[in-house]
Amino acid sequence: MKQYLIAPSILSADFARLGEDTAKALAAGADVVHFDVMDNHYVPNLTIGPMVLKSLRNYGITAPIDVHLMVKPVDRIVPDFAAAGASIITFHPEASEHVDRTLQLIKENGCKAGLVFNPATPLSYLDYVMDKLDVILLMSVNPGFGGQSFIPQTLDKLREVRRRIDESGFDIRLEVDGGVKVNNIGEIAAAGADMFVAGSAIFDQPDYKKVIDEMRSELAKVSHE
């Protein structure tokens, strides 16, 4: 298994002090910044765009930034996020008219590319694009708002995606987003995930390092027989 990565979702941070909160989470031991983009069309919420990402880079954030696009259409905005400093760009297959083309567009703009699957989205979109993926992100809540509870059926879906990744032989991260907490991160990792998005579980606590250390401690107990 790859090294586990913890990716705080800045959707749950204090937007009035976003640079400071993001830097604090990284200093507390996080690996990746998860950046949620919502357009009030594909999902019923409106969040942040490329200018905010560029501001984080200008603030001095050098860690990988994982941009999760919950927008439709997708292709128009991809180059803007790449130019602003995105490291990874993921999108929902339902939001793209041509999934293969969007994946190629992300790569052409110098970013890693990934697909995102909502709780009820079938995995059949993976059938012909595994060779173009760096990340597969499973939503364990319905996208749109932070602070929701983990949907247990995601564990079976994780096992299936882990099997597909292992059989493909490709180097693909398996990421989970939604309701990830200290008390379930071990179970999620055991099902095959190696990258964990956590928003309110980290940012709603006064001590980010304590939460991230507790998550690492749970992950250290996971065995992959």
Curated annotation (Swiss-Prot):
Protein keywords: Carbohydrate metabolism, Cobalt, Iron, Isomerase, Manganese, Metal-binding, Zinc
Cellular component GO terms, alphabetical: cytosol
GO aspect biological process, one term: carbohydrate metabolic process
EC number(s) given by UniProt: 5.1.3.1
Pfam family, one: Ribul_P_3_epim
Cited SUPFAM superfamilies: Ribulose-phoshate binding barrel (SSF51366)
Molecular functions per Gene Ontology: D-ribulose-phosphate 3-epimerase activity; ferrous iron binding; metal ion binding
Keyword Zinc: yes
UniProt pathway annotation: Carbohydrate degradation
Binding site for a divalent metal cation: H34, D36, H68, D177
HAMAP family per the UniProt record, alphabetical: RPE
Function: Catalyzes the reversible epimerization of D-ribulose 5-phosphate to D-xylulose 5-phosphate.
PANTHER family named in the record: RIBULOSE-5-PHOSPHATE-3-EPIMERASE
Protein name: Ribulose-phosphate 3-epimerase
Taxon lineage: Bacteria, Pseudomonadati, Pseudomonadota, Gammaproteobacteria, Enterobacterales
Gene symbol of the encoding locus: rpe
